[in-house]
């Protein structure tokens, strides 16, 4: 009888989880436009965290660096190394862009696990990490596409488009298709990994509270950092590729 009751309770839990509505969104109506408020709120929170922490550390730099200053210098050096490795000697102007991508994605990913978004109640839906929404990841991927087009055209002019018929004009459709697959792979890889991580934690918390979810959350933090690094590295690689003109 006890086994039967346990089985029924387990099934009820699965039923409750499956009954959760997914994809609800909270919108603000601004004129004729609908603004996705959830993404906007969480994105501005992440931006505020980055701005405030940066201002507090660098507003008064010390000759003998503080621990916070040392940390930011290490992060900057790390971003420079990634940019130089992927872009080459002309990496300098692209460090701010690559760094912004990396830091925004990194803090966004970690905010999903460390910030209590769920306690903030909305009329519809709930808050989550900005990168948990496909709108954010697609926007970042499209921004990356604009960046590597700009990098190639600004260096080579209209000759940049000659790459589409290299090494043979027969590859023109494939080379054009590649420009569509790059942002698709960037956006869906980041979105899928962050969404899957949060769903796994939610399900495990529902089934086995405070036992299994903790190591899974630590694993999620690690993979979230890796995803930020992958996105920034690929963005730098695409920019370097467009400037060099080879595949």
Curated annotation (Swiss-Prot):
Keywords: ATP synthesis, CF(0), Chloroplast, Hydrogen ion transport, Ion transport, Membrane, Plastid, Thylakoid, Transmembrane, Transmembrane helix, Transport. Gene3D superfamilies: ATP synthase, F0 complex, subunit A. Pfam families: ATP-synt_A. It is found in: Plastid, Chloroplast thylakoid membrane. GO terms for cellular component: chloroplast thylakoid membrane; plasma membrane; proton-transporting ATP synthase complex. It is a multi-pass membrane protein. One of its GO terms (molecular function) is proton-transporting ATP synthase activity, rotational mechanism. InterPro entries: ATP_syn_F0_a_bact/chloroplast (IPR045082), ATP_synth_F0_asu (IPR000568), ATP_synth_F0_asu_AS (IPR023011), F0_ATP_A_sf (IPR035908). The chain crosses the membrane at residues 38-58, 95-115, 134-154, 199-219, 220-240. HAMAP family: ATP_synth_a_bact. Belongs to the ATPase A chain family. Key component of the proton channel; it plays a direct role in the translocation of protons across the membrane. F-type ATPases have 2 components, CF(1) - the catalytic core - and CF(0) - the membrane proton channel. CF(1) has five subunits: alpha(3), beta(3), gamma(1), delta(1), epsilon(1). CF(0) has four main subunits: a, b, b' and c. This is ATP synthase subunit a, chloroplastic.
């Amino acid at each position: 009888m006890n086994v039967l009751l346990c089985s029924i309770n387990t099934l009820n839990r699965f039923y409750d989880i499956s009954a959760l509505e997914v994809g609800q969104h909270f919108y603000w109506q601004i004129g004729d436009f609908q603004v996705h408020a959830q993404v906007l709120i969480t994105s501005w929170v992440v931006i505020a965290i980055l701005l405030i922490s940066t201002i507090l550390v660098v507003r008064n730099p010390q000759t003998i660096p503080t621990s916070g200053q040392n940390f930011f210098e290490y992060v900057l050096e790390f971003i420079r190394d990634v940019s130089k490795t992927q872009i080459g000697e002309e990496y300098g102007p692209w460090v701010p862009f690559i760094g912004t991508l990396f830091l925004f994605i990194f803090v966004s990913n970690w905010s999903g696990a460390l910030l209590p978004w769920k306690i903030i109640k909305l009329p519809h839906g709930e808050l989550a990490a900005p990168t948990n929404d496909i709108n954010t990841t697609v926007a970042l991927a499209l921004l990356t596409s604009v960046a590597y087009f700009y990098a190639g055209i600004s260096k080579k002019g209209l000759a940049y488009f000659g790459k589409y018929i290299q090494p043979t004009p027969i590859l023109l459709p494939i080379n054009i298709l590649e420009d569509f697959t790059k942002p698709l792979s960037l956006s869906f890889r980041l979105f899928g990994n962050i969404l899957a991580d949060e769903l796994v934690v939610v399900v495990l918390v529902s089934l086995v509270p405070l036992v299994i979810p903790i190591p899974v959350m630590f694993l999620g933090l690690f993979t979230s950092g890796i995803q930020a690094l992958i996105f920034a590295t690929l963005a730098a690689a695409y920019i370097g590729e467009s400037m060099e003109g080879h595949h």
